[in-house]
Amino acid sequence: MKGTGLNNFPQFGVMEGVKILVCGGAIAGPFGATLLGEIGAEVVHFESPKNPDSVRGHYGYSQNHRNQLSMVADMKTPEGLEIFKKLIKWTDIFIESSKGGTYEKMGLTDEVLWEINPRLAIVHVSGFGQTGVPEYIDRASYDAVGQAFSGYMSFNGTPKEAMKVSPYLSDYVTALNTCWTALAAYVHVLRTGKGESVDVAQYESLARILDTRPMEYFTDGKEFPRTGNKDTQAALFSFYTCKDGGEIFIGMNGYGPVRRGYPLIGLPKPGDGDPEIDEILSGWMADTDLGRRLEAAMEKFVSEHTVDEVEKIMLENQIPCLKVYTLKDCAKDPHWKARDIFVEWDDPMMGRVKGLGIINKWKNNPGEIKWGAPLFGENNEEVLKDLGYTEEEIEDFAKRGITASFDFDQTYEIYKLEELFPHYREGFTERWKKEEE
């Protein structure tokens, strides 16, 4: 927000007073800082005047950079590097996302940063990590690269085609990993007084949630063919298409659901005298003759009922299930409304917008959206003043291109915003009218 600097961040939330400097663009690094900023952390997003965040001009930037300040300076100049170092001295946690080894090549090793701030928690986020095979370390990465290299993509899709999980699973899982590792490093600093550095690799973040599949591969040599939405292990634990085309997930597994659920789909309960089904305790393997018999019974049942009918019948009998929601369904659902997931906030480019709010409900110290994503370099002046620079120095930095800030017409030209978001100019104009008043 215009007028906010390092010394007047709003005070709220469980992360109140914790300072975070984040360098890098897109999702994997900055989004973790955003989550902490929404519960009170003081976040400054540091960008290059020649290489702005690649998601600026898109909805993702608006939602994923709330409660942040924007500082833009060229670290390749002595003055810009000095600004960066002063921010390192100010901050508690430094998060950077770039190709592995980038900061080391710039001469900004962890040891150099700790000379400036011995109590600094550092998180390096990259596609392939800071160590390992050099030709991998130096590669750029996108979400789909992380999904492919982690092996995650190989489990999703059909036998004919692998499929990436949308939207941007690898990026967001890495951001969540970044978030908790930053906090763990910070706790270590608080406990010991000594800095810590963490190397977060995008592909490893996703590999860590491959469930037991790596263990099964290395222990038993098991391989996992792609089967679409059908569970490869348990029968009656999958997605089904109903009479009206509606889709629903049903999980008829566990001692209770098996006994309550089988009669609903025309099967006897275990113990009723069917020699095959009497063997079942809490479920059965999918790829067996009995598993195929169970699936055939369910397919027949859903083909005779609409998705709403199936959901009602299953829920009345305490069978875990839910039809596949669209965002339209989410927006209308009373439970979503009751928990205030969708909220409005003011965006400097678009005006009043609506999207996802703050997840996790804090009883005593709730999170808040104080302002929308900042404009490019919007807080340069305030941040530089709080770092001790004079007005003359700040003006000189801008004139020489060491710092840069938002230029509306230039931004339109770069991002073709009129094509993407026709309401941008109107929202921007309204915002600055209010500020001038």
Curated annotation (Swiss-Prot):
Q: Which pathway, metabolic or otherwise, does it act in?
A: Lipid metabolism; bile acid biosynthesis
> What is the reaction catalyzed?
deoxycholoyl-CoA + cholate = choloyl-CoA + deoxycholate; allodeoxycholoyl-CoA + cholate = allodeoxycholate + choloyl-CoA; allocholate + deoxycholoyl-CoA = allocholoyl-CoA + deoxycholate; allocholate + allodeoxycholoyl-CoA = allocholoyl-CoA + allodeoxycholate
Catalytic residues? D171 (nucleophile)
Lipid metabolism listed as a keyword: no
* Claim: Lipid metabolism is one of the keywords in the record: no
Alphabetically list the UniProt keywords. Answer: Transferase
Q: Which Pfam families match?
A: CoA_transf_3
This protein is called Bile acid CoA-transferase BaiK
Higher taxonomy: Bacteria, Bacillati, Bacillota, Clostridia, Lachnospirales
